[in-house]
Amino acid sequence: MSYKTASKEVKDMLVPLSWLKEYVDIDVEAKELEEKLFSCGFEVEESYEVGKDISGVVVGLVEECEPIPETHLHVCKVNVGGAEPLQICCGADNVHAGGKYPVALEGAQVYATAKDHVTIEGTMKIKKGKLRGYESCGMLCSGTELGLTEDLYPGAGYNGLLVLPEDAEIGADVKPLLQLDDWIFDIAITANRPDCESIFGIAREVAAILNKPVKTPALDYTESGVTKDGFTVTVDAPDLCPRYIAHYVTDVKIGESPAWMKRRLALVGIGSISNVVDITNYILKELGQPMHAFDSSYIEGNAIHVRRAHDKEKIVTLDEKEFELNENNLVICDGVKPVALAGIMGGLNSEIRDTTEAVIFESAKFARDNIRKSSRALGQSSDSSQRYAKGVDEYATVMASKRALHLIEELGCGKVSSTHVEANTGNSIEPTEMKASIKKVNGVLGIEVPTADIERILKSLNFQPVINGDELTIQVPAYREDMESYPDIAEEVIRMYGYDHVTPTFLKAAAVTSGGMNTKQKTELKIKRALCAQGAFEGVHYSFFSPSDLNLLGLPEDAPERHAIRLINPINEDLSLMRTTLAPQMIHAIARNQKNGCLEGRVYEIGNKFIPKDLPLTEYPDERETICIGIWGKEENFFTLKGLVDTVAETLFIDFEYVEDKKTFLHPYRTAKILYNGEEIGYLGQLTYEIQKEEDMRESAYVAEIDLKALRPVYGKVPTFTPISKFAKETRDLALVMNKSVTCGEVEKAIAEASSFVESVELFDVYEGLQVGPEKKSMAFTVTFAPKEEEFTTEAVDGYVKKILKNLNNKLGVELRS
């Protein structure tokens, strides 16, 4: 269980090369080792030298040191191993003749610090210069200027020059001396390999890669402490705690950890707290096993109980947060009260203090699912809970307990008692047997790996192989919980044998299947390119959303969008439903952009929404491919969004119709539904002011959603070519009077239907007032007629206009304005 460590955020696992070398004899360079790890299935996201930003710094001896009058500066003669000493001006108060310090030579690179001499502000190059008239040919350095902290090197935290050992060789590079030449590997560990979430776990793999033996960390100790008579451990929830080990340590002396331990913890992102606490954090990184130390004086009843929490039972954890628990949470209790939230964090009431004299060390295996769910439900995460959630093996639990006791003895901070209790130890830490055939293993790989190589590889991975003809028997260590069947054996063989041995071949299907995109992919690409040409960016969101997203839209309970599929095991409640609309995520995206200072923009997403045919599910849902478009900004409006929707239609060589509509989340007078061939396929409109306010939007926003699956029949449609007429076009302006309920779209449609010679209809004026009467309005249109085979006559065009007016009157009650 994690203490309040001063740890920085680490996205993967940091592995110092120097720590690895304690367990494996590594005789290759760091970069070569990185390549070997990568070729064996480990993603090394980054590798770097600890002192990568430091160069040109050597050991210097100050031979003379004289103060510069009326300043805090000193002028020094510094021997750096050259023919003549260098003259360097220095303002540190701990500089003196006879002292050895790091010297940055001319052209060297070190870290630049702020006025507090602690905060790093980038790097700087050292140049020759003058201070108060004195030439200065270099710089004497502090620990901070070399990127060091007190945990990385003793004395580096002092606000002055870093004092080097008296036996440091003058003129030598300081990197090896200060261990700045160490390397760090930042390794991403996949979910199926929790055994590699530790330095020793990686060391086992490196040993196999280099075909070297791996050295086990020292586990021996002597039981010399006072016994704790009558101490018991009981596990009332064996399904949640397969193994629990408690060991009593007396004569504890809380103090600082040795420099080597503080340095190693610092290299993996953990700050030193005290020797006992550091031991638990050290083992977490070294062996991958979370541990906890209780102050024995606060454990009442001389007992430890592992049980489910009582409903509404409370505990205050080490970070001083109080939690109300339920029976889904596992707790560690003494005879009276909870003293830890199992696998997540210790209790404040039993923490290690400066006055602690006796400690109970805990090493346990907790059910990963329970720890993961408890951590998520309580909103409480720690290094330990994250580790338990990935899985901890029985072997590490036993090994870590012994390692902690060895370190207690090695650091001289306590005496190990013979009081040692293991509970619920029914699960074996011995290897389990697995059988396979060499033929099957090679069949999975598609190549013939020599039997001798298979045996060598499996032996190096500690599988203890026995081969009898074609039969292969291995012993799977307790820490390899990922090994289930012969394909797993094949994977282990090929990653060590080398993927480069596999000859690339085409799939058999590739011989008869032509490459390239299908019609659907080509059409979608055209739509994307067309929208990008209009200044829109593509967005991608999860296929899941939150129940609160449906509330954001203000949808009624019987709305189809509310009939969403709930996931059995969601990542979290915000991603618990399969989305039935793309609008909420687009709204959130618009809000995020505005909050981040992007006050105008256009975004689209092409993705699936999932419409269940019935709930609970009895058959697969209908996956509707959909495009959602969102725009926002001062220059955007309903019509610019309509233009983008029309762009989609134009790309497909079709026309959309727009009819006034109402939606709970869109402006009541700036909303339309989109029709194709009379069927509704989407909508567009402005978000309501309530939603814009709730999402903290500063600019108006508009969204559209179109069902692309409904348009699949027109994918790949080839447009027909109509030759440009060689005859002159004719136009007529029509001022029409109609009821206010008649829409522009209805009028345009009726005009176009009346004559095949109508090429276009454009609205140019709208009037409401006394001249047309109440409940009436006037709209004026320019109608363009295009001849096909001969010139128009005035009489012919007048005839078309009469047909138009008749059709308008019959269908919409529209009349020509007098």
Regions found by a protein language model. Give the residues of each.
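A carboxyl-terminal module marker
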Residues: E35, S460-V466, D482, K613-L617, ...
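Terminal amphipathic helices with adjacent charged low-complexity linkers/tails
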Residues: L210-V235, G412-V441
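Conserved mixed alpha/beta core segments that line enzyme active sites in large multi-domain catalysts
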Residues: V59-I88, L267, S274, T280-N349
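Glycine/proline-enriched, intrinsically flexible loops and inter-domain linkers
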Residues: L17, E35, P67-P69, L210, ...
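Phosphate-backbone binding interfaces of nucleic-acid-interacting proteins
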Residues: A6-E223, T227, I360, D383, ...
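Beta-rich nucleic-acid/ligand-interaction surfaces
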Residues: G51-S55, Y221-S224, A511-V512, G516, ...
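Extended, well-folded interaction surfaces typified by the phenylalanyl-tRNA synthetase beta subunit core
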Residues: M434-L599, R732, T784-A786, A796-S818
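Mobile "lid/hinge" segments at catalytic clefts and subdomain interfaces of large enzymes
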Residues: R132-C141, E145-G147, A156-G160, K175, ...
